[in-house]
Design a protein with these regions (language model features):
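Single-stranded RNA-binding surfaces
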Residues: 1-179
């Protein structure tokens, strides 16, 4: 979603974001991607959420936990995009790896394939269980597709009002054909 910061609560170390749902979402400081942190941190021992965000600032978020009862959804700015074989985490370079369901020799083979992928700086990738038995070429193709999709989403986010929703369902990927 492309949301708008509606309120900053330094005492909670969080912001509330209007992203089009009935209740505003809750975005804790720890869920802020590096791009939202101040560039110049000199002389600052601790950074507060009010140093990172401002009221009415637009921000791209993903729902981590749906709203329940009287609580709004839990949000993160570390969004991810799921492809056929991979999950791309555009602003989380330390994240990544291989699905926990894959073990043994298969895991070792995928580690090798993962190391051969051309993953852009500041991005992370997880190989899904569907990536098992896929060549490095097929995995790279899926990664390239996800990067292009991310670029399109960001372009749309720049030019549209907030509340932009992007849901990639495995059965609704237009134009996502195997190599």
């Amino acid at each position: 979603y492309k949301g708008k910061v509606s309120r900053i609560e330094p005492s909670l170390g969080a912001a509330f974001v209007d992203f089009g749902a009935e209740r505003h979402g809750f975005l804790p400081f720890k869920e802020l991607a590096p791009q939202y942190l101040p560039k110049d941190r000199k002389g600052k021992e601790r950074i507060s959420i009010k140093d990172c965000l401002s009221k009415d600032q637009e921000i791209i978020v993903q729902v981590e936990k749906d709203e329940r009862g009287n609580k709004g959804a839990a949000l993160t700015s570390f969004y991810s995009l799921a492809g056929r074989y991979l999950v791309l985490m555009p602003n989380n370079p330390r994240a990544g790896g291989i699905s926990k369901r894959i073990e043994g020799e298969e895991r070792d083979e995928l580690k090798e394939a993962l190391s051969s992928l051309d993953i852009p700086k500041n991005m992370g990738v997880i190989i899904r269980t569907a990536g098992l038995g896929r060549s490095a070429k097929e995995l790279q193709w899926d990664l390239n597709y996800l990067i292009q999709y991310m670029i399109i989403l960001l372009r749309i986010a720049i030019t549209t009002q907030f509340y932009l929703l992007s849901q990639m369902k495995q059965d609704r990927k237009v134009g996502h054909q195997r190599p």
